[in-house]
């Protein structure tokens, strides 16, 4: 199965040159996404106004929105969306960053939600970043047809009235 790298136009270059996502068949894998590029600090949208650090939304909200909008843009470029996510990993630098992230995540990720894991770790590679997210989604247009099991004559169907 061929794979295709997804690069968002205007995305900040990183020393590692990792694509925003990779599509392989019906699957799309978003790279770990933070509030700024590896080694480059936080994106202006996350930092906020330098003279008014407390103006507007809290940094955690801005950071989560930037991350999920970036993943959504990469998925859209690959023919899917966060709504088709099946696996979601979150890495946080402290418990205090979980609630702001989840507040924004609820706006992007609706039920049925993907399988999910949250990991706490002391720091991330983008200076000042407090959350990193990677996600796997399926392209519904390329998803395999559902498997229908012919169970009508299976003994368990009769025994348990399945």
Language-model region placement:
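N-terminal presequence-like segments and the immediate start of the first folded domain
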Residues: 1-69, 73-87, 92-162
């Amino acid at each position: 199965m061929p794979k295709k790298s997804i690069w968002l136009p205007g995305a900040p270059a990183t020393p590692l040159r990792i694509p925003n996502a990779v599509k392989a068949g019906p699957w799309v894998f978003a790279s770990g996404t933070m509030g700024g590029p590896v080694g480059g600090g936080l994106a202006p949208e996350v930092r906020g106004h330098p003279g008014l650090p407390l103006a507007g939304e809290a940094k955690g909200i801005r950071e989560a929105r930037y991350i999920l909008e970036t993943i959504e843009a990469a998925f859209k470029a690959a023919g899917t969306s966060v709504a088709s996510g099946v696996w979601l990993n979150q890495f946080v630098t402290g418990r205090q960053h979980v609630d702001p992230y989840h507040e924004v995540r609820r706006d992007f990720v609706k039920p049925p939600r993907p399988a999910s894991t949250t990991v706490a770790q002391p720091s991330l590679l983008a200076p000042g970043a407090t959350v990193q997210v990677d996600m796997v989604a399926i392209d519904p247009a390329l998803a395999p047809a559902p498997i229908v099991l012919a169970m009508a004559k299976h003994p368990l169907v009769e025994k348990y009235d399945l």
